[in-house]
Structure formats: C-alpha cells, structure tokens
C-alpha cells in the first residue's frame, strides 16, 4: 500500500510539472507557429528548404573545443568575473516627445534598441523596455539602463523588429506600444 501511495504521489508530481511546463510554453510571449498565408510566404523564401530555414553559409554553433554538454555546463555554472558592472550604468533620460519632428535624431536605448528620427519620420527598432525574457532571472538589464518605458515613446511611424529573440522583441513592450 505504501509503495502504491508513493507511486501515486510521484505520478501526481510528474503530471503537475508537465501541465505547468505546457502552460508556461503557451504564454503569449513565446509566440506561435505560423499558419495560413504567413506560412505560405515563409515556404516561398529561397532559404526555406525541407521544413526549415537554411543559412547560405555554414554557421558553427559550438565555437570551443568543449563538448556540447561541457559547454552547457560551463555556461550555466561557471563564475565569470566582471560579467555585470558593480555600479549602475550612468544614463541620461531624453524627453523623447519633446524632440522636434523636423530634427533628425538617434537615441540609443541599449543593445539593439534605438529610436531613429529622420525626415520627419520616427522609426523604433527592437524596443525592449519591459522584460527581455519570459522568466525574471534571465536577461536582466544592467542597473541604470532601465530608464525608459513604452509610455515614454512619441508616436511611431515604423516599428522594426530585426528578429524574434527576446532581447530584440519584447512582447509586453510591443503590446503597450500598440
């Protein structure tokens, strides 16, 4: 009877973890697979072959002499000195809405995020102002760099997303800009 109870508890834990994992992966920030016209357009791309995109040039995924497993282990558990600054990064917040539209300007927000204002058009590129990851302990911004929010943005003419990695496409920022 004790063995059966232990089995039920273990099975319950496994089922709970599985359900939690599936629910986690179905967050809107993970996006969804393309379908319909979008999928057909993707399939017509010259780099799309055999169900996936192929790089024109060979891309080396592991650039060290380590095995994949030891590389992952090292990435997760190795202590790297100087990886994060000890002090907040100095930053000056610009009043973006007050920049005259006639004035050409470039405001860099960090990493790949910037606002380009040229010829009376405003182009926002890769905005990440909320969270660059669906989990709070990954991709934390450096202290001092999180000074802008989507509410600080002026009216945008064009929104450019270079690719769909979390550090270039912040779901919550894009939803708030909408």
Language-model-derived ranges and their functions:
Residues 3-133, 138-140:
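Metallo-beta-lactamase
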Residues 44-45, 137-178:
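Active-site metal-binding motif and surrounding structural segment of the metallo-beta-lactamase
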